[in-house]
């Protein structure tokens, strides 16, 4: 998960391709791409000339500083997951993060492990997984997320899709049963599910816990609702990151206050989900209403930490609104009429693919052109 910095009406600070701002390997100052470009050197010493269109925003914040700040905001979420699911939550998060770090260290650029991006990817991937998933699957998902979600595109700032969600999509396709088996909440925080220790590619044998359906699964397939208070505090079944919605909102508000997060994207997502679900509920009361749709599943985690990835989200503010509205609308459609109970992952990945087109359509007119003069007239 990478975050962005708002920049007025023109756009926000990016790491896409890292042309606007590149932190040198020796820890030196940021290099800003000017109107005609800014020269620099890669970690291997090869001279580079970075070219990028405006806006060019100067900031004292380095990439590692932003990344590790985001990691710090995930600590309360991880603590809540551990409280509800026991030590298995920490093991799953550690396995996913380890997979990310090993591939980053082996195949990534020298020194890239220290920027914190691989740690964020591993933690966010782990938060999308059930607590009882075998650890080797979580590790494999982390390796896939970095290898095929980030490095194959050229590394940090070059990827098209959110790496954590791409890793989750891979696990969903490869191991659908494990990804849709939700263990019951742990009776104590020291609990470890036996299924975590299953050997690779072998049957885990008997499961030592009773499984439970997620609130979305109960609503979609059994037409049973879940108490809104339980949804708010996270006392329900689901992925690790589905149990700390209130904490995620608080942490997201802090990131927005620090201007490390483009608040327009989550606000647009929540607005779209609330508006469409409320409208459909008014037309057909048997469908879930806006409060349930907002609090259930991974919507809050996806809106705050996944969709706001600066590399895979639009540059302009108008584009951010369009991006967020699209995610919210698609999420509701998949939840109500799709084959799966949850649609946040696929909606974000789908809108990731449209980001270049959104950027092109909402790009501000070049200063001095006829279109720009009409806008300022």
Task: Indicate residue ranges for each PLM-predicted region.
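Hydrophobic alpha-helical segments embedded in the membrane of multi-pass proteins
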Residues: 72-74, 98, 116-124, 139, ...
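C-terminal ends of transmembrane helices
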Residues: 100-111, 146-157, 250-259, 304-313
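Loop-to-transmembrane alpha-helix initiation sites
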Residues: 160, 164-165, 290-298, 320-322, ...
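Long hydrophobic alpha-helical segments that form multi-pass transmembrane helix bundles
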Residues: 163-248
